[in-house]
């Protein structure tokens, strides 16, 4: 099955990611991969205030939080932060 979902992320979330280098490359590769693999399981899950189940995936030194809006075929990235926080 070939899935293609749009991935939405607010540009400000990338402020914590280095401007270049291996860490940025890993984060960007993961973000891009969500387009074809939107249901990638995270290392952890939680629920937001409207009860969306959110996946939290640790990629290198960063934790990326996202949820899938399946009816409109989108992945919403809602947080990127240092994985040690």
Give the location of each predicted region.
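Arg/Lys-rich, positively charged N-terminal/basic patches that mediate binding to nucleic acids
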Residues: 1-31
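A near-ubiquitous, low-amplitude feature marking generic local secondary-structure context
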Residues: 10-17, 27, 42, 49, ...
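Glycine-rich loops and low-complexity Gly/Arg-rich segments
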Residues: 28-33, 81-84
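Intrinsic disorder/low-complexity signature
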Residues: 33-34, 76
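Short proline/glycine- and basic residue-enriched helix-capping loop/turn segments at helix->loop/beta transitions
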Residues: 35-39
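Basic/aromatic recognition patch in beta-strand/loop cores that engages polyanionic ligands
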Residues: 43-85
